[in-house]
Amino acid sequence: MWIKTTDRPSLTKVVLSHIANIRMRYYFIFSTIFFIAIISGVGGIYYGTTLMGSSYGSIFASFYRYFRPSLNIISHTIQGIRSSPDRLYIDMSHLDYEKLSHQVFNAKERGFITQDEKSVEVNASIRYNVEEHNVKVRLRGSFIEHVRDDKWSFRIKVKNGSTIDGMSRFSLSSPELRNHIHEWLFQRNLMYENLINLRYKFVQVYLNGKKLGIYALEEFFDKRLIENNNMREGLILRPDDLNEEGKPFLYQASKILKDSSKQAAYNKVIDRIDEYKRMKVPASTLYDVTKSAKYFAVATLYGGQHGHLKENYACYLNPVTNLLEPIGYDSNVSRVLSRYGGMIESPNN
């Protein structure tokens, strides 16, 4: 009986088959990488031209930050899961929640948040570190990303002369809107240089029992900010941002201007700002040049020139020197370093 044998492929055919498989594998890998690059490039253009400033802008920007390769991503993820940030509980009535929700709806319909919507304040209570405080709550921010989903940005004012962590006014925002840890680093650097800085930390926020996630808690302007920087109480103003009367914007103006001595100080600094703008006096008669130089150096290092826009650039009038000192605020650090020329990501540093 004959046993039929199958023809075995030659060694040459086996080698060629393996080469073909390797080529197909590399072709698939190359095609995948090329496809991802094209999608990322087109997506970047779409973000820059359409999404930036929309309710999806911060999500899209975060995609690029989250998916940048990092050898520490696993350890950082584990550390994040095991962390236990302070918890801050906000409670308000259903009616007050609906008042804010109505403002959010109007803002989303329009595409941005107006001053009218931000002027609607509601009563609430905050539980933090066992203590309970009565507060006023309103929306904050101008771009729609401040109210995307349920993670709204808030401005908090503590009532009855009370404070939370030493602050009577502060903001709560999604960390994405303050560029995650970058703003915290910026504020720490200002502290290191003995410049006026804000208290800044991360907390877990709950609203009426619902977990909203991690928020950036950022101190806002009032006398306690100045006291925390070991300075004497003084005016806080935006020298280049004019109010309806054509005068520099003054924080807490209705309260400050009731004090005759503070009103006199405000009028004097208005005159000096006007003289400086008309080039009648040098900058050294209006600004603390040494501290201003340090501040601008730090801001440039971090790419934080967004804080120099007239509506963001705030100064403290030191009653001892009678000079303006910059306050680091809303610097938008590290989001657009290439645009602002920030140095911390430069290949030469």
Q: Which residue ranges define each predicted feature?
A:
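Phosphate/dinucleotide-binding and metal-coordinating scaffold of catalytic cores
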Residues: 2-3, 10-349
